[in-house]
Amino acid sequence: MAGKKTITINGVEMEASEEQTVLQLLNNSSIEVPQVCYHPSLGPIETCDTCIVSINGELKRSCSAELKDGDVIDTLSPDVKKAQVIGMDKILYNHELYCTVCDYNNGGCEIHNTVKEMKINHQSIPFDHKPYHKDESHPFYRYDPDQCILCGRCVEACQDVQVTETLTIDWERKRPRVIWDNDVPINESSCVSCGHCSTVCPCNAMMEKGMEGEAGYLTGINNETLRPMIEITKGVETGYGSILAISDMESAMRDERIKKTKTVCTYCGVGCSFDVWTKGRDILKVEPQEEAPANGISTCVKGKFGWDFVNSEERLTKPLIREGDHFREAEWEEALLLIASKFTELKEAFGPDSLAFITSSKCTNEESYLMQKLARGVIGTNNVDNCSRYCQSPATAGLFRTVGYGGDSGSITDIAQADLVLIIGSNTSESHPVLSTRIKRAHKLRGQKVIVADIRKHEMAERSDLFVQPRAGSDIVWLNAIAKYLIENGKADERFLRERVNGRDEYVKSLAPYTLEYAEEKTGIDQETLIQMAEMIGQADSVCALWAMGVTQHIGGSDTSTAISNLLLVTGNYGKPGAGSYPLRGHNNVQGASDFGSMPDRLPGYEKVTDEQVRQKYERVWGVPLPKEPGMTNHEMIEKIHSGQLKAMYVKGEEMGLVDSNINHVHAAYEKLDFFVVQDIFLSRTAEFADVVLPASPSLEKEGTFTNTERRIQRLYQVFEPLGESKPDWQIIMEVANKLGAGWLYEHPADIMEEAAKLSPIYAGVTYERLEGYNSLQWPVNADGKDSPLLFTERFPFPDGKAILYPVQWTEPKEFGEEYDIHVNNGRLLEHFHEGNLTYKSKGISEKTPEVFLEISPELAAERGIQDGTLVRLTSPFGNVKVKCLITDRVKGKEVYLPMNDSGEAAINLLTGSHADKDTDTPAYKETSAKMEILKHDGISPLPKINHRNGNPQPQIGVQVHKKWARKDYIFPGDAVKRGMGHNG
């Protein structure tokens, strides 16, 4: 059979694929072989020497041996067993077995399990303590060199999966050990706290601090007591068998009190899923699983360690009702009756459009569905929106124009396998850290090409093959110029255009102004570089374009998004693996909030409210008439409050009072509302203006689904009971609706999803049963459950099945005048999320990044006499901020960068204005200028020494195992067996 090999294993002949190693074949065939250092997500590391088998009569490491036709493999011979035991002996020389009192005795310790499986009763080489102390310096995990077996999993994960490139093994020492950067304490290194190392560690050497002293019944014993206990046990032990049996009993007992629950991350749009280990209300650790569809074993600092907010003392636990200038606690019944009374009163007096509703991109799909149903079906208004209006609506608009669906056209796996990745206006490694690891890995190990266009030199820019810095707001110019160049030079995919795309002629005409000369003049990118970009894109077999708020948050954001999609059509980069458009969604469920109808002009599944047949479908199921005119965007709502047309708002899980632009203007609007309801887990800045505050539950306290940036729908399961009297948002919305007479009878979020699936064609086959565990579905989903990981393989969702080249022109950015000479770019930092309402609750994160800072260029610092820690005031026409400076070459000239992670005097939206994308009302946050005033010259750097940005990474490929093999004290176990040696020294 083509592609198959005939293999003999332990005398049995079988067929196997040639695209695997011997160990993979053995594992797939359920043939047990020790493999302490091997991890499927890491590949062969070759450090442990326990996976040795006989291949054609020669002892070899099975993890790295490529399978060949005719191979004869023996896993049972005495020589194989001897070699494996020699490898295991060396591991036990480095690792002391005290399993019963070990926090890692939870059934997953590779050393414990391998000793048991190999039936090793005694080790030939006594354990020998290493001359190193534990490194406890990091807030989230610790390293115990004395227990480290030098398998290198952590190094492999850091170097080639996460690609932070912090960890190495110093093989030159007498007793090698893992080191961080140039051998500094963990907390002073370039470690980004992603947690990969502790996730893949096969034992207790690298472990989350949340586990220490908490996991076991006999753990947490102080060292003065523990050490004598271990020594006494060693003195009386009769063999490992009995000791391991006792530890297995203790491990089984732990299952009674340690709960492991699958959830989906509540932070960015990557959609990482993982198990949360808890004891009572304590979170012991987050444990990602290989089968997690978006992230596998990967996490970032927030997803792995940023959960302290769930148990914060600042959580809201009872409803609050305003009395004058303060709040008092109230019972649910009183709060709900007040809301129903006020909503009814205002609706009757001013009409349903005097009320407006904001749903949350932090909440579940089911909760977004209910919020828009409350607005439309109970109140009778289409005034409902979500925070995609602040970030992703322009990208959605651009994709609707050109390809018909407002979501990523493929999956993260497509991005990883692309020939070239084009990143525009996205600080991917900090905004979507796990997704960025897939690009960094492909770039490092596979030679994937990366082009970055951004005004700021972030990590992905530094790693890229080509980095260009266009003038702010000019991306559409170079995009159109490159498309024009490719078409005119015969480098467009003419067959794709002819067979699958409409509008070519009009589009080509629209490109006439976009010559290379014009593009150079307007963008600042020289013609030679523009041609280089065009040639790289044109020659690539497959291209993925990624973009984010650096594109969308401009007054021409929709048009630039359209231009990106146009360029992909010109080059035929839709409908095939490794290609397509990827507008990176910012929040965990900003995609889902829009998908499930929290938009003023769209019902769930993006069906238009103006479509009579669509409305009739919903009216039949909901049993009420629906409004037919599109409602207000959240941006318009603020203006309608000021004009007196909007009287009441219900805001759920959205910090509008900080994340909307021109927040002084927003706050003034809130004060004019007749009635304001805010539903949140904390008394947010927005909630401070409310008349009623309802205590909601975060994701760990409820069931539901999120939809990530790939259109991937995933289930989350309840980890904790709601704190105090807080409730899941879906229950609160239902109770509000029922006080208004709705009569809803949902018993579980699954009931809500079932209703949505009946109404919206793109969810037709979505059920909770199909989403069980780590299963997921990428919409559109057919009724039979078949989903769509890759869109547009056969047709585009337009009547004739063809995409559309949609002509767009450049809208120049807003001018602020010469007085405001500093351009204030803004965005995210890795450690914090948005205004920091969640992440500043984490002590460890706050220690590493306690405050925001203003990045300024060395040249601007020299011109103004600024140093690290200088306190400045930035003033725009709309407000001012006070913030400390940090000098860095990540920015240049009079470009500065102010992260959005502040809710006080440095909150970026004190500076931003109300101007917005002309097509979607998305605020033009990135078009902000200010003047600078020095308030205090001398100060302490806002970036602590322990921040990873001060580190010194050490890039290398993997663990450099050849350095181990070159050591004088190393002998390959296979050679030791040949020489008749009992162990390898």
Curated annotation (Swiss-Prot):
Domain 4Fe-4S ferredoxin-type: 139-170, 182-211
UniProt remark on cofactor binding: Binds 1 [2Fe-2S] cluster. Binds 4 [4Fe-4S] clusters.
List of residues binding [4Fe-4S] cluster 4: C265, C268, C272, C300
UniProt GO BP: formate metabolic process; respiratory electron transport chain
Pfam family, one: Molydop_binding
One GO molecular-function entry: molybdopterin cofactor binding
Domain (4Fe-4S Mo/W bis-MGD-type) ranges: 258-314
Residues the record lists as binding [4Fe-4S] cluster 1: H95, C99, C102, C109
EC number(s) per entry: 1.-.-.-
Residues reported to bind [2Fe-2S] cluster: C37, C48, C51, C63
Cofactor(s) needed for function: [2Fe-2S] cluster; [4Fe-4S] cluster; Mo-bis(molybdopterin guanine dinucleotide)
Binding positions ([4Fe-4S] cluster 2): C148, C151, C154, C201
InterPro entries: 2Fe-2S_ferredoxin-like_sf, 2Fe-2S_ferredoxin-type, 4Fe4S_Fe-S-bd, 4Fe4S_Fe_S_CS, Asp_de-COase-like_dom_sf, Formate_Dh-H_N, Formate_DH_asu, MoPterin_dinucl-bd_dom
Domain called 4Fe-4S His(Cys)3-ligated-type: residue spans: 79-119
NCBIfam families assigned to the protein according to its UniProt record, in alphabetical order: Fdh-alpha
Family: In the C-terminal section; belongs to the prokaryotic molybdopterin-containing oxidoreductase family.
Protein name as annotated: Probable oxidoreductase YjgC
Source organism of this protein record: Bacillus subtilis (strain 168)
Lineage of the species this protein comes from: Bacteria, Bacillati, Bacillota, Bacilli, Bacillales
Chain's gene name: yjgC
